[in-house]
Amino acid sequence: MAMARVSLGRELIAGSLLAVSCAAGILAQDLASSLDTRGQSTVDGKTAPYLVRHLPVNAFPELPAAIQERLTRRGCMIPQTYEAHRPENVVHASLERRGSSDWAVLCSANGAVSLLVFLASGDGEATVVVTAPETSRLQMHAMSDVMGFNWAIDAATPEQIHEAQLDMHHPPPRVDHDGLADSVVEGKTVYRFFTHGAWTIVETQD
């Protein structure tokens, strides 16, 4: 009888743990779904459904706490491109000068997406480089008949920027610190560069 009670107790515990695990999984799925934006939009004269997936700020633990706090106060979520396989659109690079520790983030809030930059010299305050309606950054893709988000940012090293300028008749001197690669998925990339206290777009054509 004692062994039977022990066995029954173990089965009850195992069943309880399984139920808790399932409930946690369902809760995580519900939370992820609640961060998504869905709707219908018209692009190039065609109306289609869209889905934009977002991640919360705390999905990027590498972000300094002060920057996480400012993003949270803005109500930011981090939009993910339709081809994302890992968390993206948060960049750590030397954007102000060689060796500086700076951050760039795509912040989605209130239907708009802003490219925010936090320079190490800026005491944690954000510079808004560019803003666009989230629905203006949608496109169809081969993975689905639902439109997805197409805006991606990445660090661009001096070498990458130099390579992008090689087709110019007179390429300028190589820059001395990182820029930002601002891309449309499966489309054009422009390079944003901070110099003389302002953001510019790097020329890659004559």
Name every feature range the model reports, one short phrase each.
Residues 13-25:
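Bacterial N-terminal signal peptides
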Residues 22-58, 134-206:
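Acidic, small-residue rich beta-repeat scaffolds with periodic aromatic anchors
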Residues 97-107, 177-180:
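Acidic/hydrophobic-patterned starts of short beta strands in beta-sheet-rich repeat architectures
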